[in-house]
Amino acid sequence: MKILLEKLQKLERMEEIATHAEADYEREPENAEYAATFDLAYQNEFKAYIEADKYIEYMTDGNIDFMAAKKMIQTKRAELISILSV
């Protein structure tokens, strides 16, 4: 369970980084460095999301499939983190 908590926390960090990078890019869309930074941040966010999703599927031995895990992360993440933090 600790691994899942770490993956969800990593996802939250990657989302924060991507949000800041997106704000910089939107403020100065002609800035190539901001564009590249946002692209990389978004890729890292997506990778963290997929890792958490696949880990839920793995740890439940497929009883929670990829799509159900995706929905859990999108709609019940706070509850998951709360339960796993105990």
Please place each PLM-identified region on the residue numbering.
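Short, charge/polar-rich alpha-helical segments
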Residues: M1-E15
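A structural signal for well-ordered alpha-helices, especially hydrophobic packing surfaces
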Residues: E15, T19-E22, Y49, D53, ...
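Positively charged, low-complexity intrinsically disordered regions
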Residues: K10, M14, E28, N44, ...
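N-terminal functional modules and adjacent low-complexity/disordered segments of proteins
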Residues: I3-E6, A35, D61, T75-E79
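Acidic, low-complexity, intrinsically disordered interaction modules
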Residues: H20-K71
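Amphipathic alpha-helical binding modules
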Residues: G62-V86
